[in-house]
């Protein structure tokens, strides 16, 4: 009896259990109805981790940027120093280049002057002789040698002749002063008068260049050299005047003839040739007279005025009586 009852109670109990399970006390976990807090916490942790990672990356990028800026500043300083170094090197290069160009230009200028001194000694001798022979040719311009070797040597020769005149006249003076005066006188006349006559020739429309004028006046000093060399060794004023008129006159006429052939117009010829002839002849007179007066004045200043030689003057001796002389003689004899 008990068994069926027990059998009845068993299914009923199991049925109640089933009902309870189907009711609110079901043992099956409904994942859909569960709270999602655990999953959200995991997601929050992931987001926090991601944010921390991003912050670390940003900090790393910031540090890298700061380091890059520092490196950029350092590289900028190095670049500035390198730029300054390049500028200094460029300036040094430019200075050296300018000095080299100046040296090259100086050599080039010397090379430009070389044709004016490229002449044979035979040609110089021929031109020296021609400078003493006037040629009467007015219709055509006479040829002028465009070289400066002969005129320059004549100027130095004139300087040497002036110094020789000082030595032969027993002139005692400091060599520097004497040499400077002679060189200044000769070169001053050659360059100064050549420039002045060239200016007059330009005003008078004469066909002549500066180099030709220097050559013409330089070879014209050959007569001055001959005249002064002879008259310094033979001291006669009459001989000087003869050489002044003949030798100096021939060299002056040669230059006048050349300028006449290269100038158009009687008035222009008279002004130009008259000025040149007057200056050339007066310069020879100056070298013979005034130059020595200057030196004599210097000598008087250095040595002082000449003192007259010592001369003996006769004096009157008073007359002594014979008694005094006899007494003196006796006294001398007794002492002996």
From Swiss-Prot:
GO terms for cellular component: Golgi apparatus; plasma membrane; transport vesicle. GO terms for biological process: cell differentiation. This is Protein YIPF3. Residues 165-182, 231-239, 291-336 are lumenal. Belongs to the YIP1 family. It comes from Gallus gallus. Coiled coil: none annotated. The chain crosses the membrane at residues 144-164, 183-203, 210-230, 240-260, 270-290. Residues 1-73 are annotated as: Disordered. It is a multi-pass membrane protein.
